[in-house]
């Protein structure tokens, strides 16, 4: 079934993107200054991109990997500078990971290009994405792998790299690497960073919709007998949809043509008249299926509880997945999806949001808007070791006694995010984590990693952090951006002091008379907290402290009162 309703939006945005990233590639000398070097910070915006394994029956999501990037000029004197498109360009190229897996082309790896026109109204060459980005080996020229400049976010952006989770040797790799390089006007490479482009086809329907399964019980109606189980399941979905909704769907079907999804509204025009008459894609998937997860876990991890195994998690029945496990990284061992997002009914907007629950306040009291009214860092990271807002019905605390274990209050069926705007860990007002910036104008994701993949994550995720600062984990080394040691004080990210030997020599002077500025991270008893852990193993003043060591006064010497 042809779905041209999105064609105009895709075409308009595609033409705008083809206008280039601005900049024309002027040399970056003005931004770098004397003695400058460069760093490229880049990350996938979501931490995972789901893509249909086949587009022959219906499509939920196309190949569309988004990467944000910033270029920092390091200076031997003075602060570093974040460069714009008038000073530098950013391009990407394929690079092998430590196992030798490389993904440079999408040609021959999917039937997407066969169905792009009837599904998305886009006439594309093989290897070309919906907004004009290309896979490196498929691109007809450098423009196809050059990032544009996103003026609204003030960074470089690659919208919609059409990558699939199959490498050039035909092997499955859902976490392939791509090299993002800053180049000057002559095309000379100034700096590069290797970044994961996470992508997974593990968005399967067959667990429930394959013939004979719970949603396609034998004898109920004439189900598909396609030998390909995923194709069979998808055909059964259309059969069931026709029976329930009175439709007569003809493949290929773009689900979002009726069920609005902001992820596919690239022009940002909002739902069409046709879409307004139907539930959003999130509602018809999450809320509708919420009571059909018998035997699966659709609840947050309780204090002291363990994270359910991947095959038992409700979200992983459709999101990638029991094998992919796209929720990975620093929080994975303590929480599951529901600790942040709430259960499936909440995600689908079955209950109205509480006051302050919507991203901009305009949607309070209404069903949550997919892709916008989402959990925030400040919801769990609401305070520090000495200050945390009083929250009625506050969720339980994590074992560290500082962070909330859930992002919403107890008993809230809407899972409205807790607001703690004064927290040192809060996003910018009215912005999601993935759209916020912090210290020095860097994107939050540039230093902490992608949403759902906060460093440390899997080995390929950790490559970027290791290249930028010498070890995995969040960017915590001042030297990642500062050639000259930053000045003493608490002007670092989230009010941090400088890291390294220079601070060891200077911290006593700072502590004397300013103990209250130490306690938010080192604790009221100055014995250290989770907020004062070592980012890496280092030797300071002759004492070696392992990564993860909680540092307080007593780690190295007596406390502030001589005890």
Predicted regions and their residues:
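Bacterial Sec-dependent N-terminal signal peptides
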Residues: 15-35, 563
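Conserved small-residue
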Residues: 39-148, 154, 159, 165-166, ...
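Bacterial N-terminal signal peptides
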Residues: 7-16
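Inter-heme linker and motif-flanking segments adjacent to c-type heme-binding CXXCH motifs
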Residues: 187-192, 213-245, 262-563
